[in-house]
């Protein structure tokens, strides 16, 4: 898949998915762990939980309710962040599913947030990638 898609296209897709993820996080009123845009990762986004909310408990709520696994915080940020991956074969639709699971989980877990992060990500992803033809999706009947 990597060589078929092309390295430049893969890197651009990862950057695009990362930007959409950060748009959702920002809309929710949450913060990403990495504060410097030059240091943003194109393959995962670590999201800080608000004070008084444990990231590992939130991850468990999402797993129990939606059968979706989020990454955990490591070392000094264990229990303080959860991670959303947007690499490999992740595409616009799989990212939207992941962000929907996170937003539903925030509501179920009682984590303070502003609804609509999925819409913020969707608005970014609806814009065509520069220089690329639109992707065609298979329709399943």
Task: Specify the residue positions occupied by each region the protein language model found.
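Conserved PLP-binding catalytic core of the aspartate aminotransferase-like
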Residues: 31-65
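Short gly/pro-enriched beta-turn/loop segments at secondary-structure junctions
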Residues: 18-20, 25-28, 38-42
């Amino acid at each position: 898949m990597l060589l078929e898609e092309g390295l430049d296209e893969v890197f651009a897709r990862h950057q695009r998915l990362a930007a959409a993820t950060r748009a959702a996080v920002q809309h929710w009123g949450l913060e990403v762990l990495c504060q410097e845009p030059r240091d943003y990762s194109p393959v995962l986004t670590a999201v800080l939980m608000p004070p008084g909310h444990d990231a590992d408990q939130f991850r468990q709520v999402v797993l129990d309710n939606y059968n979706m696994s989020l990454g955990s915080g490591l070392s000094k940020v264990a229990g303080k962040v959860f991670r959303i991956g947007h690499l490999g074969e992740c595409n616009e639709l799989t990212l939207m599913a992941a962000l929907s699971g996170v937003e539903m989980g925030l509501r179920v877990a009682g984590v303070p947030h502003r609804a609509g992060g999925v819409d913020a990500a969707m608005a970014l992803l609806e814009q065509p990638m520069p220089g690329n033809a639109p992707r065609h999706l298979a329709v399943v009947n």
